[in-house]
Swiss-Prot record:
Annotated protein name in UniProt: Versicolorin reductase stcU
UniProt xrefs under NCBIfam families: PRK07231.1
Catalytic activity: (4S,8R)-2,13,16,20-tetrahydroxy-7,9-dioxapentacyclo[10.8.0.0(3,10).0(4,8).0(14,19)]icosa-1(12),2,5,10,13,16,19-heptaen-18-one + NADPH + H(+) = (4S,8R,16R)-2,13,16,20-tetrahydroxy-7,9-dioxapentacyclo[10.8.0.0(3,10).0(4,8).0(14,19)]icosa-1(12),2,5,10,13,19-hexaen-18-one + NADP(+)
Function of the molecule: Versicolorin reductase; part of the gene cluster that mediates the biosynthesis of sterigmatocystin (ST), a polyketide-derived furanocoumarin which is part of the most toxic and carcinogenic compounds among the known mycotoxins. The first step in the biosynthesis of sterigmatocystin is the production of hexanoate by the fatty acid synthase (FAS) units stcJ and stcK. The polyketide backbone is assembled by the non-reducing polyketide synthase stcA by condensation of the starter hexanoyl-CoA and 7 malonyl-CoA extender units followed by cyclization and release of norsolorinic acid.
Entry superkingdom: Eukaryota
Reported consequences of knocking out the gene: Impairs the production of sterigmatocystin and leads to the accumulation of versicolorin A.
InterPro entries associated with the record: NAD(P)-bd_dom_sf, Sc_DH/Rdtase_CS, SDR_fam
SMART domains with a match to the protein in the record: PKS_KR
Alphabetic keyword roster: NADP, Oxidoreductase
Keyword Transmembrane helix part of the UniProt annotation: no
Active-site residue numbers: S145, S146, Y160, K164
Family: Belongs to the short-chain dehydrogenases/reductases (SDR) family.
GO function terms (MF aspect): versicolorin reductase activity
Length: 264
């Protein structure tokens, strides 16, 4: 086997949550490009998910879309069951579904707190639980944290950052729990990534961001990185693809920052 073969995913089956758009879609496509068959999970937009499926198929692999609300543990169990029923087994689970939230502590309601933690924290925990139950030995669980989780405090961002901070602890503990099946558990922690939500979300991070033009938002986000550019979904997808591969079999319990060195 050549060294490049260690990065291939031929014969593997991957499931990506929140894969209808943005980072999740890029992850699903990247895994497919490396040879994996892919389950594209989505919450609401079947049309968007089917476009991702079509792209994966056009690149020579196979894929299906399955709707599931990852905030509902029963729905997560059903999602994994359907994935195994369709493809026969499961090797990789990339948990990407999440929601963002901004608000000063004085304004945060219990409903908003619960809305964010239901998906970002509770949802990812039960995705990991069901991944452990469904993955073959030697599988991969890859969760999604954030560079605001433990590296840098952000005003009006406590609920979101806290919901992601829990993921860092999950990873360290679950890596131990999952060792008996030789399953590795890691997380990616993206910074600013240029998805369809990039401009609106980035303005929340920038003081007086509502007064910035789109070009100024781009420049500000790029300035944070010594590489002087904004992150792209494919930047995260490449790291997830590596963690999913045989080349990463000795990496577990780690949170990998994917922010171009923005917070250092």
């Amino acid at each position: 086997m050549s060294s490049s073969d260690n990065y291939r995913l031929d014969g593997k089956v991957a499931l990506v949550t929140g894969a209808g758009r943005g980072i999740g879609a890029a992850i699903a496509v990247a895994l497919g490009q490396r040879g994996a068959k892919v389950v594209v999970n989505y919450a609401n937009s079947r049309e968007a998910a089917e476009k991702v499926v079509d792209e994966i198929k056009s690149n020579g692999s196979d894929a299906i879309s399955i709707q599931a609300d990852v905030g509902d543990p029963d729905a997560v169990t059903k999602l994994m069951d359907q994935a195994v029923e369709h493809f026969g087994y499961l090797d990789i689970v990339s948990s990407n579904a999440g929601i963002v939230s901004f608000g000063h502590v004085k304004d945060v309601t219990p409903d908003e707190f619960d809305r964010v933690f239901r998906v970002n924290t509770r949802g990812q925990f039960f995705v990991a639980r069901e991944a452990y139950r469904h993955l073959r030995e030697g599988g991969r669980i890859i969760l999604t944290s954030s560079n605001t989780a433990s590296v840098k405090g952000v005003p009006r961002h406590a609920v979101y950052s806290g919901s992601k901070g829990a993921i860092d602890t999950f990873v360290r503990c679950l890596a131990i729990d999952c060792g008996d099946k030789k399953i590795t558990v890691n997380a990616v922690a993206p910074g600013a990534i240029k998805t369809d939500m990039f401009l609106s979300v980035s303005r929340e991070y920038i003081p007086n961001g509502e007064t910035f033009t789109d070009e100024q938002v781009d420049e500000c986000a790029a300035w944070l990185s010594p590489l002087n550019r904004v992150g792209l979904p494919v930047d995260v997808a490449r790291v997830v693809s590596f963690l999913a591969s045989d080349a990463a079999e000795w990496i577990s319990g780690k949170i990998i920052g994917v922010d171009g060195g923005a917070f250092r």
